[in-house]
């Protein structure tokens, strides 16, 4: 399976996890000339205050070289995500008053054997999922992972 397909499966997994925790997915792979945001999600608190999360998903196999994807969230990448978020808010001005934050989801995946796949179905939790021959696990979800400069 290609890197792009693995990345998309990782994003699918995180979107499902967010929905299971009360978030509504507003957009997936929102892109403009500045970059792309993997997931844009909204959560409304009990007091009706809405949070808008711009989520960067990093899906990595064991033994990767960039600390599970954390090393790929450079200042340059953060600036691209922020510029893309500004474009999203300009396109959807009704969301501009929401509390905005930039989250990062670290997902690991591995190829599983048929025997392991059968076991994972019965032991699966909300933070792990199997798709075909791959098992995905949410290693870490970092809310407000980097500074939000959106007004």
UniProtKB/Swiss-Prot annotation:
* MF (Gene Ontology): nucleic acid binding
A single Pfam family it belongs to is UPF0102
InterPro entries reported for this sequence: Restrct_endonuc-II-like, tRNA_endonuc-like_dom_sf, UPF0102_YraN-like
Which domain of life, per UniProt?
Answer: Bacteria
Q: Tell me which NCBIfam families the record gives.
A: YraN family protein (TIGR00252)
Return the similarity comment: Belongs to the UPF0102 family.
Question: Matching PANTHER family, A to Z?
Answer: UPF0102 PROTEIN YRAN
HAMAP family associated with the record: UPF0102
Q: What is this protein called?
A: UPF0102 protein Ava_4800
Organism field: Trichormus variabilis (strain ATCC 29413 / PCC 7937) (Anabaena variabilis)
């Amino acid at each position: 399976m290609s890197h792009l397909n693995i990345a998309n499966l990782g994003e699918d997994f995180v979107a499902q996890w967010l929905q299971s925790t009360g978030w509504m997915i507003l957009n997936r792979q929102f892109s403009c000339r500045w970059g792309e945001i993997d997931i844009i999600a909204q959560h409304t608190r009990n007091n009706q205050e809405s949070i808008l999360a711009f989520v960067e998903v990093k899906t990595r196999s064991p033994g990767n070289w960039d600390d599970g994807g954390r090393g790929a969230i450079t200042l340059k990448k953060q600036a691209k995500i922020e510029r893309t978020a500004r474009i999203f808010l300009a396109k959807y001005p009704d969301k501009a008053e929401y509390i905005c934050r930039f989250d990062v989801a670290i997902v690991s995946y591995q190829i599983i054997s048929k025997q392991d796949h059968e076991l994972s179905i019965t032991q699966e939790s909300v933070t792990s999922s199997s798709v075909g021959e791959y098992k995905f696990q949410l290693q870490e979800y970092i809310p407000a992972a980097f500074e939000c400069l959106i007004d």
